[in-house]
Structures are given as structure tokens and as C-alpha cells.
Amino acid sequence: MHERGPVSRESYVLYKTRNVSRGIMLYYPAIYYRSGTARGAAASPAAPASRTSYFTTMRLLALNKPFGTICQFSPHETRASLADWVKVPNVYPAGRLDSDSEGLLLLTDDGALQARIAEPRHKLVKRYWAQVEGAVDAATLKKLAGGVDLGDYVTRPCRAEYVEPTDTLWARTPPIRYRAAIPTTWIELSITEGKNRQVRRMTAAVGFPTLRLVRVGIGALDVFSLGLQPGESVELPLKAPWEGMA
């Protein structure tokens, strides 16, 4: 439960100690308890105005995580952490990005929303731009799209296509290694799993190591449309990742 933040921990304690009846209402994106839902009292659906003090103002932030930043708030001896870029208290990452990956990261103080964004069972699409070493052909894109056997699991089918980065893509600091004799290819992968280093493992498994990896989208959100440069963040409506989606 520690990954879900204080809201989820408190709701979990209420549930496990049976101090709250089953008469609760999921009022997206969080759970609200009417004061009369304590065990022994009649439970009824609650409107947002009737939430208890367990739930204060919930927040959702989008951050363009810079290269080299570790995905935690605890300080690190040699690397930047999220605390260097995000000054809003009590928010936690909804999913992760490796320190050597860049791009869109969502943070929230609501455990239910955090889970809905991050957990693979909810199948929220995450879009990645990967600059890989070598000239990727159509057959390789088909392999990536059909699912890749990584040894410990086979990835879900996904969308894989060529992409040509525009001037809106920021330069990485430091830049990738450059080899004059070896071309590179930019591809876009749209996946719903987001397991540990999944995109990098997928491209390596089909013979094209990833040199640079940028998460450009989560659900309906796009880092370019948000206008975020590395290290910049913006607060969003709680339903933003799903706005406009079918």
C-alpha cells in the first residue's frame, strides 16, 4: 500500500478494520464516505460536498521528466530527483520512468487515480518515441506490434510505427552517442503494460537497441500539446487522461 499514497492507506485501514460498511460510492476518481457510512449506520451514496476529512483537495500534475532524474522524491547523492522539479506536496508518481528515459510523468495525491493511470489492467495507452540503433524495416515493426517474447513474458500486442520527430522535441542533455557509420530510426510504440524497461527490452529483442526513449503521451494527454519543456510541470483536471477518449 505504500505506493498508493496517504489516501489509499487510510481507506485501506478503514476497510480492514471494518469501520466502514460496504455502502460506499465510487465517485470518480476517488472514494468518498458520507458521515453516515460507519458500521451500524445506514449507508447512502455521497456527493462530493459530503466527503470526510480523509479526502482533501485532490491534485493531478503533469511533469516533463528530464533525462537523468530518478523517479522518486527522496534525495540522491549524484542524481536529480523529482523533488528538484515538483514543489507540490504529497503527490506521487502514477507509474515510473527510468532515470535514462524522458517525458510525460503524471503525479497525484489520490491513490485510486494513481492506480487507474498506472496499473496495466486498466489498459491506459502510453505512447513512447524510441530512437533506436539501426535501420528498422517493416517486418521489424510487425514483430514489435504482434508481441515480443522477452523470456520471462510475452508483451501484449501494441501499435508500432515510424515517427519523424519535429522541432517540438527538445534536445537531450547529454546527447546520445553518435556513430557516423550506423544509422538510427525513430519509432513510436503505443503500449498498455509499462513493465520494467519494457520498450528498451522489446527493441533490443528484435535487434535494435534503444538509444533515446521519450514518453510522449498517456491516454488523451500529449507532452507537446501541454507545452512542457524538460523540468516543467502543470496542474490538470482529474479526468484529463480520459478527456475526449471513447
Residue ranges and their predicted role:
Residues 2-7, 36:
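N-terminal, intrinsically disordered, basic low-complexity segments enriched in Arg/Pro/Ser/Thr
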Residues 3, 13-16, 20:
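Short hydrophobic alpha-helical segments enriched in small aliphatic residues
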Residues 9, 18, 57-58:
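Absolute protein N-terminus
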Residues 15, 24-28, 32, 53-54:
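Short, positively charged and aromatic/hydrophobic N-terminal segments
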Residues 37-48:
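Compositionally biased, low-complexity flexible segments
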Residues 54-246:
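RNA pseudouridine synthases
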